[in-house]
Amino acid sequence: MKLQISGLLLVTAVAYATIEAPEEFVSLAEMEDTLLRNLFRGYQKWVRPILHANDTITVRFGLKISQLVDVDEKNHLMTTNVWLWQEWTDYKLRWNPEDYGGITSIRVPSETIWLPDIVLYENADGRFEGSLMTKAIVRFNGTIMWTPPASYKSSCTMDVTFFPFDRQNCSMKFGSWTYDGTMVDLTLLDAYVDRKDFFDNGEWEILNATGQRGSRRDGIYSYPYVTYSFILKRLPLFYTLFLIIPCLGLSFLTVLVFYLPSDEGEKLLLSTSVLVSLTVFLLVIEEIIPSSSKVIPLIGEYLLFIMIFVTFSIIVTLFVINVHHRSSATYHPMAPWVKSLFLQRLPRLLCMRGHTDRYQYPDIELRSPELKRGMKKGQQKSAGGGRGGLKEDENQAWIALLEKATHSVHYISRHIKKEHFIREVVQDWKFVAQVLDRIFLWVFLTASVLGTILIFTPALHMYLST
């Protein structure tokens, strides 16, 4: 009897173990599958997960930037690659980890759960939501963390006053598209944008990126939003090397126009070439910066200054060339004050050599003293009597010949003096042109240096202050 009872107990234990054994070896995947089926049985993703009608879902919002792709000054756009950190609580997605093998979190497709419709308000390409619907992390207490990546083109008002030493303040405003503040509230996860994985941009540097919560009212409703402000600083090395330095070189080439001699036409040729080069630079800048009538960019002001500078240099060069080619033959006599100022005083002030090619030649007498004495003696002899009449006739012939020679010498002398006077006038005007060149050289050099300093100093001061 005892043996039968023992056998019966053994069979019962084996049967019980056979029935209970599968429940002890349930895999984690099966448990997670059971959890998902239990959680989403009857779950409606279009319904806001609240218990009471006056409950508000608080969404903790944060931003992480990975790349500043582009800042388009022409179209007022900023292109960024970011991650949107969103965290909220869904009471319908809670479970007890002990009932499901200690599972504390699961990953579910974001398309299957309720999502706060947070979008970028200043979007410029029509893509207001994140570009990729990634999975969301759901914890056992109902906390949901969703960090979708997104590529945004946001509108940004550009201030190019100090281009290329400018800074830009671009903002990204996020908020719910349909829910007001009584339904969905936004709070900042962090006051700063996460830049730990930021990939540096070759043209722009992010000085600061902070977030701030705000709210706008529309009638009786209040709509909370979060604004992230990016302070961007341009790295001006490229524009300095390929834009500003060539412009500086062209401005100083304009100054060197007044160092060239006026005999040839290189002065006008150089000035015209500089003006054409500046026009090309202006067209290049026009393709970069936005077309705005509110402000003139710094580099645009400088190019405009140089173009006016070059235009004046061309006008002055024409005047100097005109002075250089003046003479008595062109009916331009030199006034006494011009001689005194430009031939004597200004050359000393400008450290120039004096005008030494100006000589005074004594007048040649019509008759030399010896000729006068010979003629006087001949006249006395002819008056004293008739002796030596033949000799006297010979002397008179020589006297007549000498008088003709004297008249010829006088004619040659007058011609030489006239040529010398013309040459002297020509040289005087050429020297006046040289003095004018030296004056305008210093004037334009001073104006170029002062203009460059006055235009770029405010921008450099602002750029170097941080």
From Swiss-Prot:
| Extracellular compartment segments | 29-235
Task: Tell where it localizes.
Answer: Postsynaptic cell membrane; Cell membrane
| Gene Ontology cellular component list | postsynaptic membrane
Question: Which cysteine residues pair off into disulfide bonds?
Answer: C156-C170
List the carbohydrate attachment sites. N54, N141, N169, N208
Q: What does this protein do?
A: After binding acetylcholine, the AChR responds by an extensive change in conformation that affects all subunits and leads to opening of an ion-conducting channel across the plasma membrane.
UniProt-recorded name of the protein: Neuronal acetylcholine receptor subunit non-alpha-3
Origin species, per record, is Carassius auratus
